[in-house]
Amino acid sequence: MLPEDLESTPFPIIDTHAHYDDAAFDGCRDELLRQIYGYGVKKIINASVDLDSSAENCLALSRKYPFCLTAIGVHPETVEAGGTLDEQRLLSLCREPSVVAVGEIGLDYHYSDDKKAEQRDIFKRQCEIANELSLPVVIHDRDAHGDTLDIVSETRPKGVIHCFSGSTESALEYCRLGMYIGIGGVITFKNARKTVEVAAAVPMENILLETDAPYLSPVPYRGSLCNSAFIIKAAERIAEIKCIPVETVLKVAALNAARLFGNALKLN
């Protein structure tokens, strides 16, 4: 299932954001996870999008595959008009041993304006709960850059802005707040000027590598099912931008992941 032309990785890979619970993997999940582990992907964080089936499926994956860790949270797209956060359910799920973060949480104003208040309230409360549990957050920000930064500035969690799409100035502001910037396959796209500028400006010590699998496959694999081995393509592009070896990108990103998410992300 891995492309024959995919070059080998010079250093073990940590994918800090994926969705192997997604139905897109239903016909190939087990074989693919075995393949990518053999390729060199040694840690994966699966991010849930709700506190129900997605959370349970992510946790089940971690029980079957110990190299899979879990982030538990309510994604903004699953927030309902008039909805509230089931705090006790979130707290209960976060006690599971594979849970290393609260996520995927955040704001998404791309499709609708009718749930902005609910999204903000639930996002803010999840940041507060993450702080109470001493867990980092994994943040989704789509077309909501100002409000996302405001809530992070107010609640001051530690964490990562997943698939960062904001300006260089806001990326550097997040770095000043102690946050990490998540970069994946988008950086290989021909229209990725903003992401390239962010990668050039942000210190390597503030960058995490991710895929968002099964989404956002990098060039030259666009249109195919994304998987964690494809991180090598994002790492190569960052190495080119920063004029450093690919191995350095992978190594520093792995150290960053362990620093943020804890010992469970340390490479043996």
Labelled PLM ranges:
Residues 1-268:
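Mid-domain alpha/beta scaffold segments of enzyme catalytic cores
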